Design a protein with these regions (language model features):
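Cell-wall polysaccharide-cleaving catalytic domain and substrate-binding groove, primarily
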Residues: 1-143
Length: 143
């Protein structure tokens, strides 16, 4: 998809800019061509698969690691080594409609969708996906 002026997360169907690991995601493109084109980040076959992976990661943060607030979640998602984490936290908390230290329930599809959308906007400099794409990814993650 697109040219290099298109944000990387959009080109890769990876709205959260999730790093590739040794374990492939459902819907991830592990073809030689995809890996040659993108060495660091996951490339997904569809944007829905990218939103599913983003939401699954956030759910893991809450369920496995006990991260309950936007501040805790974004602190892990976007550590200060590469990011202005404080600004990221404030932007996402505002978009979700909570304070940075307020507990959020990611088993609620509306809250999870708002958080995933806010991260996608921040990572890509805008929102490039419609609400149906986000909702489909969130629904898959919550199954």
């Amino acid at each position: 998809m697109g040219t290099t002026s298109t944000p990387r997360g959009v080109r890769n169907n990876n709205p959260g800019n999730i790093d590739r690991t040794s374990t492939p995601w459902q819907g991830e493109d592990r073809s030689v061509a995809a890996i040659a084109r993108e060495q660091r980040f996951c490339v997904f076959l569809t944007p829905q698969a990218g939103f599913r992976a983003l939401a699954k990661t956030l759910l893991t943060y809450q369920r496995k690691h006990g991260l309950r607030t936007v501040k805790e979640i974004i602190g892990r998602w976007a550590p200060p080594v590469e990011n202005d984490t404080g600004a990221y936290v404030r932007q996402v908390a505002t978009a979700v409609g909570v304070s940075p230290s307020e507990v959020v329930r990611l088993d609620n599809p509306v809250t999870l969708g708002r958080l995933a959308t806010a991260i996608a906007k921040h990572e890509n400099g805008g929102m490039y996906w419609n609400a149906d794409v986000v909702a489909a990814g969130i629904a898959e993650a919550l199954k």
